[in-house]
Structure formats: C-alpha cells, structure tokens
C-alpha cells in the first residue's frame, strides 16, 4: 500500500497502480480516453493530466499524465489545480477540432465516454471554424458499424483488437493528425471478439449494427441482469429492451467471470428472442389444425388428458433453467424424468462432473484462467465451443511477457514496456484437435489426430509425469519427443491448466485430461482443470440427473409410457429424427413447452408457449459449477394482452396443481428455489446465487429502467389511450420502472445497467468496483456449488487403441462453429451471413480415392435421407474420417463419432 495526497487529502492506495487507477478506485473523477483497465497505459491522449508536487511545501508543481505516473508512497497531486483543469479542457478542444458535432444522430449518444469526458472537463463552446478532415467509412460486416469521422485517435481499438484479442485484420494507417483505424479493405472483421470494439471505443466510431436497425437511446431501454444463454461459460450480460423487443446486449461486469469482454455469439446472437414465429399462446391440435387456448383452458385440457394416461414421462433440457427442469421432474416423478440428451453426451457430462467434484483438482473461474502459465487443451475446439475461455487462454499465454517485465521491476500497467520487453514471448500452449483450431496461432505445438489418438497422447503425458499412471504402448519416437517437450513445459510450470470438455465426443479424452491434472498435482503443481460443456445449463441438468433421451424414446416405443412432456428441447439435435418422430407418433399425448418453434411441434398435441430468458427468471449453472441467476427483462403481455407466455416452471407447476386439484403453491421464484433445495441438497447453493424477492435498498426495489426513461405513458397509445398499470414483479427484487434504487454505491451485486452521475458509458463500471478492474464492490454475483475435493480419483486406466481407418467406412469428426452450431443463436437473422455453408471435409488421400476435389458435391445416407454436401479438403484431418459442421442444416451434434459407409460423388 502507498499513501498519496490528493488536493490536500490523504488516501491509502495500491502502490502497484498508476495515479489514474488509484484515483478512480477512490471514486475521484479524472477524465481519460486511451487508458482502459484491461489494456494498460500508453499515454496517447494526454487527457488525464494532473499537477504533481515534489512535497507538501511545493506550490509550483508540474503537469504529469496520471496514467503514466506510479502511485508511489508520498506522492502529492492536485486534480482541481487550475492549470491542470485548463490543460484537460484544451485537450478535449483539440480533439474536437475534427470531431463532428453530430451527437443528436450518433448512436453512441447517451452512452458515450467522449460526451462524459467533454462535460467533465467543462468544454462547452467550439472555437474552431475551419475545415474538418473527413474519412471514408468501411463495411465491417453485419455486427459493427464504422464511422471514422468520429475518431479521436485514442488507439484503444487496435490495442484491444491486435494486442489483446490477437486479431490481425484491423490496423492503423496514416500519420500525424490524419490516421485511419480500419481494415486494409472493406470486409467482415474476422475476430470472434470484434463486438467488444463497441464498448472499447470511447466514441461512436464502432457501434452495434444489430441495434441500429431498431435503435433506442440507452436511457429509453429497460434492462435486467442476465446470463448469456449461448454456451456453457455463463458470461454476465445486460440485455436492453424497448417495445417488447430486445434491442441490444451489453457486457455486464463480473470480476470473477467475463469482466469487460464477451464473444460475438453472446453479444449479437439474441435475435431468436425477437422472431415473429415464436409460440405466443397455448395451442391444441384439432385434426390437422391447432386452436388457440387461454391459460386456464390449456391447463384444464392437459390435466384431463394426463389423468387418462397410464404413464407420463418428462424430457428435460440443458438449455432450460434449473427451476424449469425441476418443475418437470416434480410433475412426472423423479423416476420418469429424462435429461433430453443422448446417452454418450450424458455419459461424458457425468464424467466431467465427477472429475470436477471428486478429482481433487481446482477448477478456475473464467478470469482466473488468465493467470496460468502453461496450458494443455485436449480435444476441445475452445474458440468455437466456449469462446470466452479462448480469449482468457490468450491472456494466459501473454503472461510470459508480464513475468519478464516484472523481473525488471516494470509495473503491470506499463503495457508498451511489457510488449517491448516480451518481444512476443509466450507461456507454452499445447492444443490437440481433429483439425486446425483458432488457437493454433499462439500454440507452441498442435496435434491433429482422431480422438482416440488425442486421448492416447494425454494418457502418455500423464504417465511421463507419473509412472504410476497407466502406460501407453506403441508411441512413435517422433511423437514421444513432442510428449517430452510437453511434459517438460507442464512440469516446469507453477500453475499449469488442463482444458477439455464434452464436445470432443470422447470420454477417454476427458479421462486423459483428468490423469494429466492428477499427475501434475502429485508433483506439487498448483494445477487447474477446466471442462467445457455444451449448453448453458448442462452442468445443472447433470447434477439433477435422470435417464438419457434414448431411454425415454424406448419408453414411448414400447408403449410403457403413453404421454410425454418435452421441455425446451429440439430432440432432433440429440437423437435420430426418424426415431424421435416414430416414438412421438406412438404417444397419445405429446406436450411441448418451448419458446422457439421446433420440428417436434409437428408431433405435438398441445404446445405451451414458454418465455425466453429475456422474459423469465431462473438459475443456470456454468461449466465451473457456478450457479447464476438471470432476471426477466420485460413482460411481453404488457405490449400485447393476447400474449400468454409464462416461465416453463410456471406452466408445469400450474399443470401439476391442476392435475392434483390443489391450489398453486409456487407463486413466485423463491418458492421453486426452496423446493429445489429441499429435494436436491447438492443444489442448495442456488439460493445464494442472488437475493430473494424481499430484498430492498432503503425500502426500495431496484429499478430496471434508467431514471431518464421516457415515453412510458405513450408507448401503447397506438393500442389504447388508457395506460395500463406497469407489470408487477413478484418474483424478484426488481421493478419494471424507473422508480426504484439505481445508486452505484448501493449494497448490491445484481446491476441491470452501468450508470453513475457523470458516467453514462460502460466506463461507469468503475463506480461499481472495489478497485478499478477488480471485483464488484459488494461481491461478484453467483456462487460456486462445489469446491475442490480433499480426496482425488484414481487414475483412469482405459487407454484406447490407436485409430485405424477402414476401407469404405468413414468416422464423423465433429467441427463446431461459433456462428451456427448453437441451437438458439443460429436462429438469429444477423447470424445467417456469418454461418458457413454446410460442407463435408475430407483428407486429400480420401478425396483422391473417391475421385473428388474441393467443391465437388458428395452424398451419403443418414437417418433414411440422402444428404448432399460440397467437399472441402483439409490436410489436418486424418484419413478415414470426414468432418461435418455440428448443429447446422440438419447435422445433429449426436452424429459425432458415427460412421458413414456409402459416401460417393453425387449424381448431377
């Protein structure tokens, strides 16, 4: 710690910080542009000037840039010194000489750091009367709009994109006061994390193009704390709504999880919530048509049918909340509850859970991954299946340069010096996969092989680290030399990290990862293990347990069950569509509860219109076992009284109560959570994931809307001049109103949107943190359900045999895509242009045998249908395998590991 003196007052601060960080952490306001907590200091903008004095007697002082000055013990500075204030105002005026005066039409208006800093410095009058330099804007793809004339040359964008996210297609061109930030030519930004430019940029150069089409000012949107639903990582988000539509998603700061950044799937993949074809009312089949029901009719009709059924089974979902899956389990009984995922996937999920719960290896939170100094990724294409983890791995690899700089006593915020000292030095990263991955550019070595051979590599590494681990026979000398390099790197690391997951299609790969981690722990290393699952609540569903989807289908096929309730699950993604359709056709009652129109609704007798994550409350559990709560952003019925969309748990409990002819006793979310905790002790922690509905701050609920929210009385005037009462939230501590507490200093961790007096942009998160870039002042939201076990598992011993290609037979290797493989985000219209066209990948040798080239269309039969796809050639894919894009164009993820036998060139 260090003692500094600011404008005559004494403060205790972190001596490792610079003065800007220290003052912002104290709650003092210093304007800045080029500095960012995640990017460090470069002193490019000169906006953060303060007056520094030699001692208490010095009255003259000198101007220094606070972001480039350490917060040393005994420092004396003044923020309010007149010369410093005039200098800061002059800097803004210089920046404004070329900045357009277009705030009223700029999409950043009201959410703009430049506006905030201009007001903070007191600059309010323009004296420049000459020609402004102008630029041509670029088309940067479907996600981001580009308006270069607003640029103030702070260099944040290229520092984030190139130095932090390792992007290669955005740069700075020109010199002096005529520099251009963009691509060499028009085109879509290639980085999976390009959307963060929207919040990194302090002006309106980079803005959210998906928001542009249905634009609202930040102060006119309703927000709620939420969790990204597009993968298993559980990033925190702030969805914004207006007129019953999601308009944008912003990053919600969580110092333990995603801190300042999201991936593009999480930021832009919300379009499925706004689709017009979503089920909005319950419907029941009458012959070939569906008739619309109200809620009471739906419940009574369903109950009447279920009473006549001899056995009702329930099929849950990894994309439904803990509460909804539990409500289904209560409706049908624990013995009749099925997870809705394939047997193989469920087996891998349970194995991953076993490793996390009983393996005795620490599971780091997302942000902690950045602190590891050697990483082994076994089998998982992390950028496509858990992209935010990939960004964290990139920071872990860069830790080598920080170590080198620290050895020379260079502060952590001196980023230019760190990059200069490091000269691209990296901590070791080793990646195995069936083919190339997006992490290969920073990897020390990559191994492209079938999953069996990847598992064998992992087992061999574990044995080399600890000879009591099972040995692997038949390792080639060349591969053994690589294993020796990996072993040396992992054994020499202080904090090695092993990453694997369930998307590999191989339980043996997960076992190999666990063995490596156990062997490293036995050597005294502070080892961590990260498992990536498939869906937002896969871990929660795994903890809850239940039979596999195949078992559920067998119940229907044999007639043992004659009614089925399917919860938020497109079963065609988890099993053969032919088998699913045949099994559902045998059931006299098929009830579907979902917020998306899926293929299985064609077999449904009753459809209950569920609410999406934006219209409901619930709990999900991420890949590290962290329970996190998402909150309802808006009530769709407020805009359309004909809409009947309820949380799935509310539908199912209401049906259960109707079936038993009793009163509904789960009238709010807390009641469901209490029931979950009572029945499933391992989920007891979900009660602490967020405060209950009685939580108040000074007697007030928390506001979902900024206090400047406008137009509420006129929003429905086109429907009726009579303004209805605002929706009443009985489930949570939030209110659908601007009336309520929204103070940044209030004792809360669940923050709907970032705002503080004088801070309207995302930089306002500074005001909510215990120290800038640290944790939220009153703790990061969420709670870990299981900590590191004191015990450890025995070594897994089932070393697989080496993969052997078979003539006339090809094994399907899974290829995942950030844009396209996820069930929900692939429905977003804006994603269509980013999704690759369906393909089949072949090794050159296999392509030669078949007599096909790149672009040739080949066909194969699957599930009774003939599939025709264009060929792509890949040198990395091992012969005897074909690669298919999982989750796209009818290519169900369950296909991973299956075999094709009739692959041939398609008839023209």
Swiss-Prot record:
Composed of 13 different subunits. Subunits NuoCD, E, F, and G constitute the peripheral sector of the complex. [4Fe-4S] cluster 2 binds at residues 151, 154, 157, 201. It catalyses: a quinone + NADH + 5 H(+)(in) = a quinol + NAD(+) + 4 H(+)(out). NDH-1 shuttles electrons from NADH, via FMN and iron-sulfur (Fe-S) centers, to quinones in the respiratory chain. The immediate electron acceptor for the enzyme in this species is believed to be ubiquinone. Couples the redox reaction to proton translocation (for every two electrons transferred, four hydrogen ions are translocated across the cytoplasmic membrane), and thus conserves the redox energy in a proton gradient. [4Fe-4S] cluster 3 binds at residues 228, 231, 235, 263. [2Fe-2S] cluster binds at residues 34, 45, 48, 67. Gene3D superfamilies: 2.40.40.20, 3.10.20.740, 3.30.200.210, 3.40.50.740. Binds 1 [2Fe-2S] cluster per subunit. One of its GO terms (biological process) is ATP synthesis coupled electron transport. Residues 83-122 form the 4Fe-4S His(Cys)3-ligated-type domain. GO terms for molecular function: 2 iron, 2 sulfur cluster binding; 4 iron, 4 sulfur cluster binding; metal ion binding; molybdopterin cofactor binding; NADH dehydrogenase (ubiquinone) activity; quinone binding. [4Fe-4S] cluster 1 binds at residues 99, 103, 106, 112. InterPro entries: 2Fe-2S_ferredoxin-like_sf, 2Fe-2S_ferredoxin-type, Asp_de-COase-like_dom_sf, MoPterin_dinucl-bd_dom, Mopterin_OxRdtase, Mopterin_OxRdtase_4Fe-4S_dom, NADH_UbQ_OxRdtase_75kDa_su_CS, NADH_UbQ_OxRdtase_ferredoxin. This is NADH-quinone oxidoreductase subunit G. It comes from Escherichia coli O6:H1 (strain CFT073 / ATCC 700928 / UPEC). The keyword Acetylation does not apply. Keywords: 2Fe-2S, 4Fe-4S, Iron, Iron-sulfur, Metal-binding, NAD, Quinone, Translocase, Ubiquinone. Its cofactor is [2Fe-2S] cluster; [4Fe-4S] cluster. It comes from the Bacteria. GO terms for cellular component: membrane; oxidoreductase complex. The gene is nuoG. Residues 221-277 form the 4Fe-4S Mo/W bis-MGD-type domain.
């Amino acid at each position: 710690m260090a003692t500094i003196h600011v404008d005559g007052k004494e403060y205790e601060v972190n001596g490792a910080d610079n003065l800007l960080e220290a003052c912002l952490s104290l709650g003092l306001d210093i304007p800045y542009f080029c500095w960012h907590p995640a990017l460090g200091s470069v002193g490019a903008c000169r906006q953060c000037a303060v007056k520094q004095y030699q001692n208490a007697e010095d009255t003259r002082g000198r101007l220094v840039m606070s972001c480039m000055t350490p917060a040393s013990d005994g420092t004396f500075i003044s923020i309010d010194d007149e010369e410093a204030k005039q200098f800061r105002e002059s800097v803004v005026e210089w920046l404004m000489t070329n900045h357009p005066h277009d705030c009223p039409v700029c999409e950043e208006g009201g959410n703009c750091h430049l506006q905030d800093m201009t007001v903070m410095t007191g600059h309010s009058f323009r004296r420049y009367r000459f020609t402004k330099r102008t630029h041509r804007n670029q088309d940067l793809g479907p996600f981001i709009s580009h308006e270069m004339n607003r640029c103030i040359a702070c260099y944040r964008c290229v520092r984030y994109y190139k130095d932090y996210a390792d992007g290669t297609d955005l740069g700075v061109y020109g010199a002096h006061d005529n520099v251009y930030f963009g691509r060499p030519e028009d085109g879509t930004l290639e980085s999976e994390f390009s959307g963060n430019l929207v919040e990194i940029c302090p002006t309106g150069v980079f803005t959210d193009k998906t928001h542009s089409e249905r634009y609202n000012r930040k102060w006119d949107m309703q927000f709620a704390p939420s969790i990204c639903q597009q993968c298993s990582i559980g990033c925190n988000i702030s969805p914004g709504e207006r007129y019953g539509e999601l308009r944008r998603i912003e990053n919600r700061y969580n110092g333990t999880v995603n801190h300042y950044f999201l991936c593009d799937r999480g930021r832009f993949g919300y379009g499925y919530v706004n689709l017009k074809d979503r089920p909005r009312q319950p419907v029941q089949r009458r012959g070939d048509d569906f008739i619309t029901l109200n809620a009471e009719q739906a419940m009574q009709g369903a109950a009447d049918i279920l009473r006549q059924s001899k056995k009702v089974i329930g099929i849950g979902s990894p994309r439904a909340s803990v509460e909804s899956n539990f409500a289904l389990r209560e409706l049908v009984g624990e013995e009749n509850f099925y997870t809705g995922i394939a047997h193989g996937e469920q087996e891998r999920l349970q194995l991953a859970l076993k490793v996390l719960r009983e393996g005795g290896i620490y599971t780091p939170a997302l942000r902690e991954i950045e602190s590891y100094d050697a990483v082994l990724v076994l089998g998982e294409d992390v950028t496509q299946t858990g992209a935010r983890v990939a960004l964290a791995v990139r920071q872990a690899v860069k830790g080598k340069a920080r170590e080198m700089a620290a050895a020379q006593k260079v502060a952590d915020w001196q980023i230019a010096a760190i990059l200069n000292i490091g000269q691209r030095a990296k901590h070791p990263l080793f990646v195995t996969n069936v083919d190339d991955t997006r992490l290969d550019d920073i990897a020390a070595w990559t191994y492209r092989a079938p999953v069996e051979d990847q598992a064998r590599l992992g087992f061999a590494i574990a044995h080399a680290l600890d000879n009591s681990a099972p040995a692997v026979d038949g390792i080639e000398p060349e591969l053994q030399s690589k294993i020796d390099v990996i072993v040396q790197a992992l054994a020499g690391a202080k904090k090695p990290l092993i990453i694997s997951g369930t998307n590999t299609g191989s339980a043996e790969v997960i076992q190999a990862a666990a063995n490596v981690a156990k062997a490293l722990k036995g050597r005294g290393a502070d080892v961590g293990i990260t498992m990536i699952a498939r869906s937002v609540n896969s871990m929660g569903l795994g903890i809850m347990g239940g039979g596999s989807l195949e078992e559920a289908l067998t119940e229907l096929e044999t007639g043992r069950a004659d009614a089925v309730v399917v919860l938020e699950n497109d079963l065609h993604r988890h099993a053969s569509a032919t088998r699913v359709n045949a099994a559902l056709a045998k059931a006299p009652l098929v009830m579907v509860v979902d917020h998306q129109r899926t293929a299985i609704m064609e077999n449904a007798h009753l459809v209950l219109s569920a609410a999406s994550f934006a219209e409901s409350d619930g709990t999900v559990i991420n890949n590290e076992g962290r329970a996190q709560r998402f909150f309802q952003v808006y009530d769709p019925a407020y805009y359309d009284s004909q809409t009947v969309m309820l949380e799935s748990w509310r539908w199912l409990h209401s049906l259960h109560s109707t079936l038993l002819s009793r009163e509904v006793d789960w009238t709010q979310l807390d009641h469901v959570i209490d029931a979950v905790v009572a029945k499933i002790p391992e989920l007891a922690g979900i009660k602490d994931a967020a405060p209950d509905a009685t939580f108040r701050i000074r007697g007030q609920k928390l506001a979902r809307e900024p206090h400047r929210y406008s137009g509420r009385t006129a929003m429905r005037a086109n429907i009726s001049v009579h303004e209805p009462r605002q929706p009443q939230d009985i489930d949570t501590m939030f209110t659908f109103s601007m009336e309520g507490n929204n103070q940044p200093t209030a004792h809360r961790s669940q923050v709907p949107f970032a705002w503080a007096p004088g801070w309207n942009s995302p930089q306002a998160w500074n005001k909510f943190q215990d120290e800038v870039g640290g944790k939220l002042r009153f703790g990061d939201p969420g709670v870990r359900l299981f900590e590191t076990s004191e015990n450890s598992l025995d070594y897994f011993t089932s070393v697989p045999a080496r993969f052997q290609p078979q003539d006339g037979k090809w094994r399907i290797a899974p290829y995942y895509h950030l844009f396209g493989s996820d069930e929900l985000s692939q429905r977003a219209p804006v994603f269509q242009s980013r999704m690759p066209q369906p393909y089949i990948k072949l090794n050159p040798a296999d392509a030669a045998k078949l007599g096909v080239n790149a672009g040739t269309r080949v066909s194969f039969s699957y599930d009774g249908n003939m599939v025709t796809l264009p060929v792509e050639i890949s040198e990395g894919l091992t012969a005897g395998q074909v690669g298919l894009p999982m989750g796209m164009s009818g290519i169900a993820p369950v296909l991973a590991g299956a075999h094709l036998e009739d692959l041939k060139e398609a008839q023209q």
